[in-house]
Amino acid sequence: MTVKEKKGGQFLDIRCCDNLELMAEIKDNTVDLIYCDILYGTGRKFADYQDLKPKRGIIEEHYIPRIKEMHRILKDTGSIYLQMDTKINHWIRCILDDVFGYDKFQCEIIWTYGIGLKAKSKKFHTHNDNILLYSKNNNHVYNPQMKKLEKPSKRWVTKMIKGVNTPVRDNNGKQETYYVTEVKYGNVWDDIPMRRNGIIYKTEKPKKLIERIIKASSNEGDLVADFYAGSFTTAEVCKDLNRNFIGCDINPNGIAKAKERGLFSFTDKPDKLD
């Protein structure tokens, strides 16, 4: 099943299929950005799908061929973000190191969503996801995302002399200052709450999280892919941000719910994906 939309040159190509089938249709070096909220390896059976068992052999059997395909279709200037939790992130990082190269690892984003801890738990409470960011090469697209400070921060103006920071002073000898009103986001994101009671999945990711990723690693008109698309929140964000989209989910309910979100009208299959 395929439903596509095209408006003013922008296209959304949404599929209900296994992601390996879709990636096999895409040419080498075509996609600008890949974001996937992957299977977390809980081993649990949910209403609409069976999650992978948390065993290394099973995880590798599923992800190695898929990550190899993602590397093939990604442009030289492209980046890949894979989101998971602490159960399998160490295994996924090893796969990404092997496929993309250890030196292409850019950072691990910690998205902490602050859900209350269980009082009886005999371990440190985990309330974060891990988002692994790799680039295909070192000339990848990166647009710094800025965080506004609630209270401007007072900083001294300094200059570098032989590697030493020294104060900058005016003609009267008074040290000059400036006020910082915004800073670049680091790799710990604690300002986006978890979205509960999602359209299909209880832990559907919030639009603000995906928006930050797409803005940081793509430009308008670029092609963004999501091969574990769920209810296609990534497609909706792409539509809002004037990015093109291709992606899939194996669950037919994802397509049905994406239609309900008003994502579709018409399109022809883009030639550059053949």
Show where each model-derived region lies.
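Conserved glycine-bearing catalytic or ligand-binding loops at nucleotide- and phosphate-handling centers
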Residues: 253, 268-274
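Core catalytic lobe of class I
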Residues: 1-259, 264-265
